[in-house]
Amino acid sequence: MNHDVFISYSSRNKPTALAICHVLEEHGVRCWMAPRDIPPGADYGDVIDEAIVACRLFVLVFSEPASLSQWVKGELNLAFTEKKIIIPYRIDETPLKGAMRLILNQTHWVDAYPDAESKFGELVEAAERFLGRPAVGAFRTEPVVPPSAPTPAPARRYKVGDYY
């Protein structure tokens, strides 16, 4: 598997997870997320296990549905066991409980509510930092407009007898 980040999320938060994936990939961070990256006919559990083991960074889209999802809990537990860097991206005010509280209590969060897109820049910068990539400038949410073409230099005129 060839990815940097595993994105864990509840299917009820799929639009947010897809947006996070898109933004990270626009910045050159290779992402893995189910079901997008699960080959047809493959066993979900086996492929997800392999993807978490192979990732360098684990992004958890944390919400009430995620806190109740057995899949998300299992993915988080495996990431913790494998000593992955975990970045929780909180999209609502759901409190931590149970095993999630034990795992995430000492982790710095990206608090992205009520507007889940408001902290995409912070997430991109954190991912680049943890992946050891140099900062390439400020995070942009709008396309960069290229500068206009430079004005050509005036043509040089030669006189008879000039050496060039």
State where each predicted segment sits.
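SF2 helicase/translocase ATPase core recognition
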Residues: 90-91
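Tryptophan-anchored aromatic micro-motifs
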Residues: 156-164
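Glycine-rich, charge-decorated loop segments at or immediately adjacent to ligand/cofactor-binding or catalytic sites
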Residues: 94-106
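Conserved N-terminal substructure of TIR/SEFIR domains
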Residues: 1-61, 65, 70, 80-85, ...
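Short acidic-hydrophobic, aromatic-tinged amphipathic segments that line or gate anion-handling sites
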Residues: 109-115
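Short, hinge-like loop/turn segments at secondary-structure boundaries
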Residues: 49-52, 103-108
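Proline-centered loop/turn at the N-terminus of a beta-strand
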Residues: 85-87, 108
